[in-house]
Protein backbone atom coordinates (compact mmCIF):
# COMPACT_ATOMS: atom_id res chain seq x y z
CA UNK A 1 0.00 0.00 0.00
CA UNK A 2 1.06 3.61 -0.61
CA UNK A 3 -0.82 5.14 2.32
CA UNK A 4 1.45 7.33 4.41
CA UNK A 5 4.39 7.33 1.99
CA UNK A 6 5.62 10.90 1.41
CA UNK A 7 5.49 11.98 -2.24
CA UNK A 8 9.25 12.52 -2.37
CA UNK A 9 9.86 9.00 -1.07
CA UNK A 10 7.41 7.54 -3.56
CA UNK A 11 9.29 9.22 -6.41
CA UNK A 12 12.61 8.02 -5.01
CA UNK A 13 11.35 4.43 -4.75
CA UNK A 14 10.25 4.48 -8.39
CA UNK A 15 13.61 5.92 -9.45
CA UNK A 16 15.53 3.25 -7.53
CA UNK A 17 13.44 0.46 -9.04
CA UNK A 18 13.74 1.92 -12.53
CA UNK A 19 17.52 2.04 -12.19
CA UNK A 20 17.49 -1.57 -11.02
CA UNK A 21 15.36 -2.73 -13.97
CA UNK A 22 17.23 -0.75 -16.64
CA UNK A 23 20.73 -1.55 -15.41
CA UNK A 24 19.93 -5.25 -15.24
CA UNK A 25 18.47 -5.11 -18.74
CA UNK A 26 21.57 -3.38 -20.11
CA UNK A 27 23.98 -5.94 -18.65
CA UNK A 28 21.57 -8.74 -19.63
CA UNK A 29 21.29 -10.07 -16.09
CA UNK A 30 19.16 -13.17 -15.71
CA UNK A 31 15.45 -12.63 -15.13
CA UNK A 32 14.84 -16.21 -14.04
CA UNK A 33 13.34 -16.13 -10.56
CA UNK A 34 12.71 -12.37 -10.64
CA UNK A 35 9.04 -12.77 -9.72
CA UNK A 36 10.00 -14.58 -6.52
CA UNK A 37 12.65 -11.96 -5.79
CA UNK A 38 10.14 -9.13 -6.09
CA UNK A 39 7.69 -10.99 -3.85
CA UNK A 40 10.44 -11.38 -1.24
CA UNK A 41 11.23 -7.67 -1.48
CA UNK A 42 7.57 -6.71 -1.07
CA UNK A 43 7.25 -9.00 1.93
CA UNK A 44 10.30 -7.35 3.50
CA UNK A 45 8.96 -3.86 2.77
CA UNK A 46 5.56 -4.67 4.24
CA UNK A 47 7.27 -4.99 7.62
CA UNK A 48 8.92 -1.55 7.43
CA UNK A 49 7.51 1.83 8.54
CA UNK A 50 6.36 4.08 5.70
CA UNK A 51 8.99 6.73 6.41
CA UNK A 52 11.78 4.18 5.86
CA UNK A 53 10.51 2.49 2.72
CA UNK A 54 12.73 4.37 0.25
CA UNK A 55 15.86 3.61 2.29
CA UNK A 56 14.79 -0.01 2.67
CA UNK A 57 14.21 -0.49 -1.07
CA UNK A 58 17.70 0.82 -1.74
CA UNK A 59 19.27 -1.25 1.01
CA UNK A 60 17.46 -4.42 -0.08
CA UNK A 61 18.79 -4.07 -3.64
CA UNK A 62 22.30 -2.97 -2.70
CA UNK A 63 22.72 -5.77 -0.17
CA UNK A 64 21.52 -8.45 -2.58
CA UNK A 65 24.31 -10.28 -4.38
CA UNK A 66 22.36 -13.08 -6.05
CA UNK A 67 22.23 -13.37 -9.83
CA UNK A 68 18.49 -12.74 -9.79
CA UNK A 69 18.50 -9.63 -7.63
CA UNK A 70 21.80 -7.75 -7.65
CA UNK A 71 22.05 -4.14 -8.79
CA UNK A 72 24.76 -3.72 -11.47
CA UNK A 73 27.27 -0.97 -10.73
CA UNK A 74 28.70 1.60 -13.12
CA UNK A 75 31.72 -0.54 -14.02
CA UNK A 76 29.57 -3.45 -15.15
CA UNK A 77 27.27 -1.18 -17.14
CA UNK A 78 30.27 0.42 -18.81
CA UNK A 79 31.83 -2.96 -19.60
CA UNK A 80 28.56 -4.17 -21.12
CA UNK A 81 28.14 -1.16 -23.42
CA UNK A 82 31.58 0.17 -24.34
CA UNK A 83 32.38 -2.19 -27.21
CA UNK A 84 28.96 -3.77 -27.55
CA UNK A 85 27.12 -4.30 -30.81
CA UNK A 86 24.13 -2.63 -29.19
CA UNK A 87 22.09 -2.28 -32.38
CA UNK A 88 21.75 -6.04 -32.65
CA UNK A 89 22.26 -7.05 -29.00
CA UNK A 90 19.15 -5.27 -27.70
CA UNK A 91 15.55 -5.19 -28.82
CA UNK A 92 14.89 -2.10 -30.90
CA UNK A 93 12.19 -0.90 -28.51
CA UNK A 94 14.59 -1.11 -25.57
CA UNK A 95 17.32 0.72 -27.46
CA UNK A 96 14.88 3.43 -28.48
CA UNK A 97 13.78 3.77 -24.84
CA UNK A 98 17.38 4.39 -23.78
CA UNK A 99 17.96 6.98 -26.51
CA UNK A 100 14.68 8.73 -25.70
CA UNK A 101 15.66 8.91 -22.03
CA UNK A 102 19.05 10.40 -22.93
CA UNK A 103 17.31 12.96 -25.12
CA UNK A 104 14.91 13.86 -22.31
CA UNK A 105 17.88 14.34 -19.97
CA UNK A 106 19.47 16.78 -22.43
CA UNK A 107 16.16 18.65 -22.60
CA UNK A 108 16.04 18.88 -18.81
CA UNK A 109 13.28 16.34 -18.22
CA UNK A 110 12.29 15.29 -15.69
CA UNK A 111 13.39 18.32 -13.74
CA UNK A 112 12.41 21.74 -12.53
CA UNK A 113 14.38 23.71 -15.15
CA UNK A 114 13.57 22.23 -18.57
CA UNK A 115 15.62 23.46 -21.52
CA UNK A 116 13.04 22.60 -24.18
CA UNK A 117 9.30 22.95 -24.69
CA UNK A 118 8.69 19.35 -23.73
CA UNK A 119 10.10 15.83 -23.55
CA UNK A 120 10.47 13.87 -26.75
CA UNK A 121 7.28 12.22 -28.01
CA UNK A 122 7.43 8.52 -27.24
CA UNK A 123 7.36 5.74 -29.84
CA UNK A 124 7.42 8.07 -32.86
CA UNK A 125 11.14 7.96 -33.66
CA UNK A 126 13.25 5.28 -35.27
CA UNK A 127 16.81 4.32 -34.40
CA UNK A 128 19.23 5.66 -36.99
CA UNK A 129 22.94 5.07 -37.63
CA UNK A 130 24.96 8.27 -38.05
CA UNK A 131 27.56 6.36 -40.06
CA UNK A 132 25.36 4.02 -42.11
CA UNK A 133 25.61 0.26 -42.00
CA UNK A 134 26.21 0.40 -45.77
CA UNK A 135 29.15 2.72 -45.26
CA UNK A 136 31.17 1.30 -48.15
CA UNK A 137 29.06 3.21 -50.68
CA UNK A 138 30.06 6.71 -49.56
CA UNK A 139 32.36 6.25 -46.55
CA UNK A 140 35.02 3.86 -47.81
CA UNK A 141 38.05 6.04 -46.90
CA UNK A 142 40.42 3.50 -48.48
CA UNK A 143 40.29 1.13 -45.52
CA UNK A 144 42.01 -2.23 -45.68
CA UNK A 145 40.19 -5.47 -44.86
CA UNK A 146 40.95 -5.41 -41.14
CA UNK A 147 39.99 -1.76 -40.83
CA UNK A 148 36.77 -2.52 -42.69
CA UNK A 149 35.86 -5.24 -40.21
CA UNK A 150 36.54 -2.83 -37.36
CA UNK A 151 34.27 -0.24 -38.95
CA UNK A 152 31.54 -2.85 -39.45
CA UNK A 153 31.67 -3.38 -35.69
CA UNK A 154 31.90 0.30 -34.78
CA UNK A 155 28.83 1.35 -36.72
CA UNK A 156 26.69 -0.79 -34.37
CA UNK A 157 28.02 0.89 -31.21
CA UNK A 158 25.89 3.11 -29.01
CA UNK A 159 27.85 6.22 -30.01
CA UNK A 160 26.85 5.83 -33.66
CA UNK A 161 23.13 5.72 -32.95
CA UNK A 162 20.48 8.37 -32.56
CA UNK A 163 16.74 8.76 -33.04
CA UNK A 164 15.03 10.47 -35.98
CA UNK A 165 11.56 10.55 -37.48
CA UNK A 166 10.82 7.93 -40.11
CA UNK A 167 10.46 10.66 -42.74
CA UNK A 168 13.88 12.14 -41.95
CA UNK A 169 15.43 8.69 -41.75
CA UNK A 170 14.41 7.99 -45.35
CA UNK A 171 16.02 11.26 -46.48
CA UNK A 172 19.41 10.85 -44.81
CA UNK A 173 19.88 7.13 -44.18
CA UNK A 174 22.80 6.08 -46.39
CA UNK A 175 24.02 9.36 -47.81
CA UNK A 176 27.58 10.71 -47.61
CA UNK A 177 28.46 12.53 -44.40
CA UNK A 178 28.58 16.14 -45.68
CA UNK A 179 25.03 15.90 -47.09
CA UNK A 180 23.74 13.83 -44.18
CA UNK A 181 25.23 16.21 -41.64
CA UNK A 182 23.80 19.26 -43.42
CA UNK A 183 20.33 17.71 -43.62
CA UNK A 184 20.36 16.74 -39.95
CA UNK A 185 21.53 20.21 -38.95
CA UNK A 186 18.75 21.75 -41.02
CA UNK A 187 15.83 19.54 -40.04
CA UNK A 188 16.59 17.62 -36.85
CA UNK A 189 15.83 19.06 -33.40
CA UNK A 190 17.05 16.04 -31.41
CA UNK A 191 19.72 17.33 -29.04
CA UNK A 192 21.70 14.10 -28.77
CA UNK A 193 22.06 14.24 -32.56
CA UNK A 194 23.06 17.89 -32.60
CA UNK A 195 25.80 17.17 -30.06
CA UNK A 196 27.31 14.68 -32.47
CA UNK A 197 27.20 17.21 -35.31
CA UNK A 198 28.99 20.06 -33.55
CA UNK A 199 32.68 20.64 -34.08
CA UNK A 200 35.08 19.08 -36.52
CA UNK A 201 34.97 19.06 -40.31
CA UNK A 202 32.82 17.18 -42.79
CA UNK A 203 34.93 14.02 -42.50
CA UNK A 204 35.20 14.02 -38.72
CA UNK A 205 32.64 11.28 -38.09
CA UNK A 206 34.85 8.22 -37.78
CA UNK A 207 35.73 5.40 -35.40
CA UNK A 208 37.34 7.74 -32.89
CA UNK A 209 34.32 10.05 -32.84
CA UNK A 210 31.99 7.08 -32.38
CA UNK A 211 34.00 5.75 -29.44
CA UNK A 212 34.18 9.15 -27.77
CA UNK A 213 30.43 9.61 -28.10
CA UNK A 214 29.85 6.07 -26.81
CA UNK A 215 31.80 6.92 -23.66
CA UNK A 216 29.85 10.14 -23.14
CA UNK A 217 26.52 8.39 -23.62
CA UNK A 218 27.43 5.67 -21.12
CA UNK A 219 28.31 8.39 -18.60
CA UNK A 220 24.87 9.88 -19.20
CA UNK A 221 23.17 6.49 -18.82
CA UNK A 222 24.82 6.09 -15.42
CA UNK A 223 23.47 9.51 -14.41
CA UNK A 224 19.96 8.97 -15.73
CA UNK A 225 19.71 5.59 -13.97
CA UNK A 226 22.12 6.03 -11.05
CA UNK A 227 23.32 3.47 -8.59
CA UNK A 228 23.42 4.51 -4.92
CA UNK A 229 26.53 6.46 -3.98
CA UNK A 230 29.42 4.13 -3.23
CA UNK A 231 27.80 1.11 -4.92
CA UNK A 232 30.19 -0.76 -7.21
Language model features with spans:
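Betabetaalpha-Me/HNH-type nuclease active-site subdomain
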Residues: 57-202
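C-terminal, well-folded lobe of enzymatic/effector domains
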Residues: 7-15, 19-26, 36, 72-73, ...
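General "foldedness" signal
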Residues: 27, 31, 35, 40, ...
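A cross-family structural signal marking well-folded subdomains
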Residues: 1-101, 201
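Generic, well-ordered alpha-helical scaffold segments in large soluble proteins
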Residues: 2-3, 13-24, 41-44, 60, ...
Amino acid sequence: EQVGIPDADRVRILEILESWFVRRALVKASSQGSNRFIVDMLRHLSEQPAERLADEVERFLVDNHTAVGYLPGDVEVRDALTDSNVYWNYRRSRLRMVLEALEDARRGYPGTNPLAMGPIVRDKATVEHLMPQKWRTHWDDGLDEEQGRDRDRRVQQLGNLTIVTQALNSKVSNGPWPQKRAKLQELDDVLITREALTGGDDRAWDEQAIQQRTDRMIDQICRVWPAPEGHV
